[in-house]
């Protein structure tokens, strides 16, 4: 057997010079050893565990039985504490931690456990459901913490090695490795900004909010979801790109409670095979402009209905989701070059990068005994329209959130519903809606618009 190994080695070594390549045999165990330990040692102190607790009211299951309720009544709700766990990443030595929005959603108390086992309570500085990201600040400390540097996620290539760090199943900090399986995954349906890094590094429940790093120890993504039939890792995990995370951090560091992103002021639609054929495209690619709001950045730059957006700052746009990501990650204050196809020719547009106007939002939560009790509503400003992906010139009052257990959520109202009338009263401002829902009536007739379709709702008082 030894002679066969020697012969095989000889054949390999003898072949190498014929190719003109120099091959050197490893001369020590150190040269053979491949280890990610130096990278892990550098980044692990910046990866934390996030524990969230929320108080919810619930009844004993027996009270769901109508016969039981008939004799004993509805029963008083009991307060219960629900707990969730996830991961986070320290991105600022002052104690700013990035995690997923879904990890801390509706949390009444948040604790962060460091790699050295110390625990700190944390406040929510910013939360952004659109990107499924949130920023926390460690409380009552002037300490400087180990923080991780952000990398350029757009520089990632399929096949690059990456490491995933987090707290799967609450067992403690865990490191897994894999490769970038795909970039620019846009049809996942996890967040409004559907643009993800796909990796086969093992990601499990509890890893949400953890770090995806390259071999330089730079943060290239925040782990957020897995595709699984079993609930555990099956080699298909998704991370929010670091370039999206960068804007969220910048907003938090600037003192904003919401993410400040560039506003386009145009409505884009997907390219279907039929539209692609009508435009003489070889394949469905790009995003079609179906409307431009007056006085918006898009209008000022000369964008027109019918333009086909094909790139942003030289980066190709395959679909609407790709455009949303590319444009949203551009820094405010400058400009972006957007290339469009118009009548078969490429036209270069310079779009100013500014936030949408947000005056007169007048947001409030509806109370009382109407079917809209528990709905948070706002006047539709360009900023609100941009947040909810409505047409920029939409007017009226829109549902921006729904309280868990509120009447509005229970009867089926949804975030993004535009309330047009209540009992024949036209609703133009939130004050109109507040006044209309204070009335005591037996029948509620509400007209709303959802997804461009008008819906008439009739409910008992």
Go through the PLM ranges and name each one.
Residues 6-14:
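Bacterial N-terminal signal peptides
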Residues 17-27, 34-38, 87-89, 101, ...:
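C-terminal recognition in membrane/secretory proteostasis and scaffolding
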Residues 21-38, 42-97, 105-107, 118-119, ...:
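Glycine-biased strand-turn-strand hairpin within the trypsin-fold
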Residues 23-24, 29, 36, 58-60, ...:
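Active-site loop architecture of trypsin-fold serine endopeptidases
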Residues 49, 92, 98, 111, ...:
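Hydrophobic beta-strand signal
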Residues 85, 91-92, 114, 119, ...:
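Short, acidic, Ser/Thr-enriched surface-loop or helix-capping motifs
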Residues 96, 118, 151-172, 252:
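Short glycine/Trp-rich loop-beta-loop segment that forms part of the substrate-binding cleft
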Residues 113-117, 141-142, 167-170, 343-345:
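Hydrophobic alpha-helix/coiled-coil detector that fires on Leu/Ile/Phe-packed helical surfaces
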